[in-house]
Regions:
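Histidine-centered, metal-coordinating catalytic motifs and their short helical/loop contexts
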Residues: 115-140
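Amphipathic alpha-helical interface segments
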Residues: 1-118, 144-176
């Protein structure tokens, strides 16, 4: 179990461009900041961009009794409003929202720093030297750092939080 989890952590932060890793997903997104606009974030799958107009139309046609609100499509004003609020959290709170507002690219530096955290590097170094390439251990070389289960848990937690942030706050998709 420990070998499998630690090898997985190493793979998730692999910077080799051919690897399917959280690091490379982040880098692919960071290379195309022009796609990270408010309009694409909010309305990419058919949600209304101008939720106020849809809300106003809904209130005019409202009847007495229990109603269900659309959560997808052009009538989902509430979902659209929440998407605007989520976008505000990653681009700042502009006094007037504009379709071409962009996500603050400084967020990528923060996420990269999380994926390069010393505890993750400690786990990766241990895996490289004791699991993946144990035959290369130099008996006269420096001691191999040993990661504890707490280190592994913290490393995995950091990676999961970065992936969750990418999934929800950058790609506007539900997390895992």
């Amino acid at each position: 179990y420990a070998n499998l989890i630690t090898l997985g952590i190493r793979r998730l932060v692999d910077t080799n461009p051919k690897a399917d890793s959280a690091w490379n997903v982040l880098e692919r997104i960071a290379r195309r900041p022009e796609l990270l606009t408010r309009e694409l974030f909010v309305a990419h799958d058919g949600l209304p961009y101008d939720y106020e107009k849809v809300l106003e139309a809904h209130l005019k046609t409202r009847t007495v009794g229990v109603q269900y609100l659309s959560t997808v499509g052009p009538d989902a004003f509430d979902t659209s409003q929440r998407m605007h609020e989520d976008f505000d959290a990653v681009c700042g709170r502009p006094s007037k929202r504009k379709r071409l507002d962009r996500i603050d690219t400084g967020i990528f530096d923060v996420l990269r720093a999380q994926l390069k955290h010393p505890v993750i590097e400690k786990v990766c170094t241990m895996v490289d030297k004791t699991v993946a390439h144990a035959e290369r251990i130099d008996p006269k070389g420096p001691a191999v750092p040993i990661a504890t289960f707490n280190d592994v848990d913290e490393a995995l937690g950091r990676i999961v939080r970065v992936c969750q942030f990418i999934s929800w706050n950058l790609l506007a998709e539900g997390g895992f």
